[in-house]
């Protein structure tokens, strides 16, 4: 059956800021309390969407979540009118106001794990929103994520949108940032690859400096609820040493697409066994695994973390060749730039490298891959997505003007205490729901 991989990028929200909330994310910590530019952040992401759509790739957009989250602040004991809640939180616990104001839902690679209909037992596309329970500012996202996905993918005969797994450390789930899929063609049955950092109940190596956010138990639960074939599901442990070096999700150290795995040589525990298992599973699905392993001598783990070489999008063109979408930081790192030149000049599947300015997102630890959720859809499934979320000339122009109208070009940590920011954000989001035709998506609209 004919199918295409669509990328749904998160639109950066009006409260984009640098609060340093993500322990284990080096960029986030290094840029704590810097002044952010929400308008630039949103436009940088939108330009990437538009350019990829212009190149013929299926490109959708997911709306921001409502921030600041008054629901969280009230749950934490702050009371009164909305402005009073914000003022009390700013005075008594500014760190909680920062968590409630985070625009981290922009990184939709963490929104959910997605399995296409070709892989699932019931022939539907399955979505499991990630519980993101390792961080407060992200643990509040999954309910709104489920609501958004249920709105966009509303046809229950074609789509199954699950609740997130129970938010406990044993089931820590970070979504598609630790998942990829290999296949001969998008519409044919493939092999789903789940990467975890630790196991709650099995003994094994664990990082010592930074937390492992994804558990084996969570990955297995997602695979089981999606109805994946056991012989076409592969689990791998990320090397704990690279987690301690700042690789907080697997998409910071490897990326896969179709029959290609682009990875650092230090990405996995027992890597050869993983390659062999993937090769055998994919062989049974009519494809041969192509591993492009970047040696540590050419690009160190530190180079990978600072440049986000592997937090790239690996996209297939109609002719079968692949293009690597990287942030401009890759061109600013001499080792990474040299490797990319070598890669593009070779005879491998990756023939082209596209470079994007995503500086505002990158300063918070989010590159091209963080900003997108991959959803493989058949023609009929794509037609069932009736909201106005597919990027084209018209939608790009409307969204660009919407950002220009509603977003600030400067947001410092102290600005989160401004009650006008809540009003501005709600006004913007209310208008956005009309643009995207998604109905009353937000709590304040209900």
UniProtKB/Swiss-Prot annotation:
Pfam families: AstB
Enzyme Commission numbers on file: 3.5.3.23
Highest rank taxon of the organism: Bacteria
Family matches, as Gene3D superfamilies: Succinylarginine dihydrolase
GO biological processes: arginine catabolic process to glutamate; arginine catabolic process to succinate
SUPFAM superfamilies xref list: Pentein
Keywords annotated in UniProt: Arginine metabolism, Hydrolase
Catalytic activity: N(2)-succinyl-L-arginine + 2 H2O + 2 H(+) = N(2)-succinyl-L-ornithine + 2 NH4(+) + CO2
GO molecular function, one term: N-succinylarginine dihydrolase activity
Residues at the catalytic site: 174, 249, 370
Binding-site positions, substrate: 19-28, 110, 137-138, 213, 251, 364
Phosphoprotein keyword on record: no
InterPro entries (UniProt xref): AstB_sf, SuccinylArg_d-Hdrlase_AstB
UniProt pathway: Amino-acid degradation; L-arginine degradation via AST pathway; L-glutamate and succinate from L-arginine: step 2/5
Chain's role: Catalyzes the hydrolysis of N(2)-succinylarginine into N(2)-succinylornithine, ammonia and CO(2).
Family: Belongs to the succinylarginine dihydrolase family.
UniProt subunit comment: Homodimer.
Name of the protein described by the UniProt record: N-succinylarginine dihydrolase
Organism expressing this protein natively: Burkholderia multivorans (strain ATCC 17616 / 249)
């Amino acid at each position: 059956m004919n199918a295409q991989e669509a990328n749904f990028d998160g639109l950066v929200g009006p409260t984009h800021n640098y609060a340093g909330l993500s322990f284990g994310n080096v960029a986030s910590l290094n840029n704590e309390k810097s002044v952010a530019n929400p308008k630039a952040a949103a436009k940088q992401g939108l330009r990437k969407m538009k350019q990829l759509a212009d190149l013929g790739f299926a490109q959708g957009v997911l709306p921001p979540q409502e921030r600041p989250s008054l629901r969280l602040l009230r749950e934490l004991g702050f009371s009164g009118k909305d402005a009073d809640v914000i003022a009390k939180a700013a005075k008594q616990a500014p760190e909680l106001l920062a968590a409630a104001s985070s625009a981290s839902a922009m990184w939709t690679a963490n929104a959910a794990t997605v399995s296409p209909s070709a892989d699932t037992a019931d022939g539907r596309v399955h979505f499991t929103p990630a519980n993101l329970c390792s961080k407060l500012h992200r643990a509040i996202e999954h309910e709104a994520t489920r609501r958004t996905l249920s709105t966009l993918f509303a046809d229950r005969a074609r789509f199954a949108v699950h609740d997130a797994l129970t938010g406990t450390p044993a089931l820590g789930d970070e979504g598609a940032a630790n998942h990829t899929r290999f296949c001969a063609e998008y519409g044919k049955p493939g092999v789903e690859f789940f990467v975890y950092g630790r196991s709650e109940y099995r003994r094994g190596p664990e990082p010592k400096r930074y937390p492992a956010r994804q558990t084996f138990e969570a990955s297995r639960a997602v695979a089981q609820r999606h109805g994946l074939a056991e012989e076409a599901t592969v689990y791998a442990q990320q090397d704990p040493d690279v987690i301690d070096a700042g690789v907080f999700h697997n998409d910071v150290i490897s990326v896969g697409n179709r029959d290609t795995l682009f990875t650092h040589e230090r990405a996995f525990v027992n890597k050869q066994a993983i390659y062999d298992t993937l090769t055998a599973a994919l062989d049974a699905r009519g494809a041969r695994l192509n591993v492009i392993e970047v040696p540590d001598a050419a690009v160190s783990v530190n180079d990978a973390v600072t440049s986000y070489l592997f937090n790239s999008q690996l996209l297939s063109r109609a002719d079968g060749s692949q293009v690597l979408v990287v942030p401009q930081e890759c061109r600013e790192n001499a080792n990474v730039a040299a490797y990319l030149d070598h890669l593009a000049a070779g005879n491998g599947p990756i023939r082209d490298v596209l470079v994007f300015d995503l500086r505002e997102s990158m300063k918070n630890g989010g590159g091209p891959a963080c900003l997108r959720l991959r959803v493989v859809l058949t023609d009929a499934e794509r037609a069932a997505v009736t909201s106005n979320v597919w990027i084209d000339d018209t939608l790009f122009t409307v969204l660009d003007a919407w950002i220009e109208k509603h977003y600030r070009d400067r947001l410092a940590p102290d600005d989160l205490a401004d009650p006008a920011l809540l009003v501005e954000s709600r006004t913007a989001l209310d208008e956005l729901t009309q643009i995207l035709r998604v109905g009353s998506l937000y709590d304040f609209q209900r």
